[in-house]
């Protein structure tokens, strides 16, 4: 029976995620490598990936460049106090900008009026300030206040890792 039509195999799915969460190895055929590691054939491996994507467990499989190695060493989390009536439209607009890697709506907190967050990356400090100004112009009068939190040092940078997590 094919992996993609059998009942959910939680162990196989978890193993696939553990094998791929840090990226695929740079080998001639990463799908064959993954299939061998999983102990299934390549077609079933691809079917499992497709099922996980269709179920929404993974969004996509793609190359993710290391922006630091490409010279983009400056980043800032821009924070914006945006009119709630406009945030859905404006959040989509800001998130579509090529220099924005993450864009989130968050609830305001006491003493922290910001509800829209957008991470920008640039080669130098002037780049990220220019991007902040571009966002400010796009938001127009719907923006009441803003700030930018600039990183001073990377303490940890990884995606979600399931390997080693224990069930409680």
Swiss-Prot record:
A GO molecular-function annotation: lyase activity
Lineage of source species: Bacteria, Pseudomonadati, Pseudomonadota, Gammaproteobacteria, Pseudomonadales
Family, per entry: Belongs to the Ahb/Nir family.
EC number: 4.1.1.111
Domain of life: Bacteria
Reactions the enzyme catalyzes: siroheme + 2 H(+) = 12,18-didecarboxysiroheme + 2 CO2
Disruption phenotype: Insertional mutagenesis results in the loss of respiratory nitrite reductase activity in vivo and in vitro. Mutant strains synthesize a periplasmic cytochrome cd1 that lacks heme d1.
Protein's UniProt name: Siroheme decarboxylase NirH subunit
Summary of subunit composition and partner proteins: Probably forms a complex composed of NirD, NirL, NirG and NirH. All proteins are required for the total conversion of siroheme to didecarboxysiroheme.
Alphabetical list of Pfam families matching this protein: AsnC_trans_reg2, NirdL-like_HTH
Species annotation: Stutzerimonas stutzeri
Pathway where this protein functions: Porphyrin-containing compound metabolism
Assigned keywords, A-Z: Lyase
